[in-house]
Amino acid sequence: MTTRNPNQPVSYPIFTVRWIAVHTLAVPSVFFLGAIAAMQFIHR
């Protein structure tokens, strides 16, 4: 049992760190893009 089975991620154990790094960049950028797109339609 020395082969890499898919139940044990040995190749990438820092998957959660990459997930946090992606979402700390993706969530604010999507929020600001939505806010800027919404501001295009607001004419006071």
From Swiss-Prot:
- Name a Pfam family for this protein: Cytochrom_B559
The cellular location(s) given in this protein's UniProt record come to:
Cellular thylakoid membrane
> Which residues hold heme?
23
The membrane topology noted for this protein in its Swiss-Prot or TrEMBL record is: Single-pass membrane protein
Protein's job: This b-type cytochrome is tightly associated with the reaction center of photosystem II (PSII). PSII is a light-driven water:plastoquinone oxidoreductase that uses light energy to abstract electrons from H(2)O, generating O(2) and a proton gradient subsequently used for ATP formation. It consists of a core antenna complex that captures photons, and an electron transfer chain that converts photonic excitation into a charge separation.
The entry describes its oligomerization and partners as: Heterodimer of an alpha subunit and a beta subunit. PSII is composed of 1 copy each of membrane proteins PsbA, PsbB, PsbC, PsbD, PsbE, PsbF, PsbH, PsbI, PsbJ, PsbK, PsbL, PsbM, PsbT, PsbX, PsbY, PsbZ, Psb30/Ycf12, peripheral proteins PsbO, CyanoQ (PsbQ), PsbU, PsbV and a large number of cofactors. It forms dimeric complexes.
This protein is called Cytochrome b559 subunit beta
Source organism of this protein record: Cyanothece sp. (strain PCC 7425 / ATCC 29141)
Q: Which lineage?
A: Bacteria, Bacillati, Cyanobacteriota, Cyanophyceae, Gomontiellales
Q: Which gene encodes it?
A: psbF
